[in-house]
Amino acid sequence: MSPKFLLFSIIAVWSCAAAIEALFIQPRSLANFLSMTLTAAKRSPQEYDGYGNYCGWGGEGTPVDSIDRCCQVHDNCYGTVNENECGHYIRNVKLIDYDWHMEGTEIVCDPKDDACGRALCKCDKDIIDCFNENDKDYNPEYNKVIG
């Protein structure tokens, strides 16, 4: 077997595995984030999705206010976690599951999760805390989806 064929075969198998995983695995971390938002944020997830330049998919430019800045920090947090604590995973960190619960009004990340899950949970906890701390700055005109 030629080295080129072997390399091609390995790349093809890896690509197929990644595609299958993306199609059939639910985005668990996103589901956790949605659940956390529904449970602990002062506003509904729909009020944040499409808000400013960073809330929702992607993000670029300058945040329009403190709520949008929360989303920019969250995007950066996921990027850092993807490179560090979750770097051993082939898949996107948005597919990684973690456990959390509420203690009164406080979000608590499960210390039994691995470093990756704990770090992702902290990113999500921090954005919910940031949303709630900056709720007075929320401006519906900045929401491209429902505004």
From Swiss-Prot:
It catalyses: a 1,2-diacyl-sn-glycero-3-phosphocholine + H2O = a 1-acyl-sn-glycero-3-phosphocholine + a fatty acid + H(+). GO terms for molecular function: calcium ion binding; phospholipase A2 activity. Its EC number is 3.1.1.4. Its cofactor is Ca(2+). It comes from the Eukaryota. Binds 1 Ca(2+) ion. Expressed by the venom gland. Its main location: secreted. Residues 1-19 form the signal peptide. Ca(2+) binds at G56, G58, D75. The active site is at H74, D124. Belongs to the phospholipase A2 family. This is Phospholipase A2 SSD387. It comes from Scolopendra dehaani (Thai centipede).
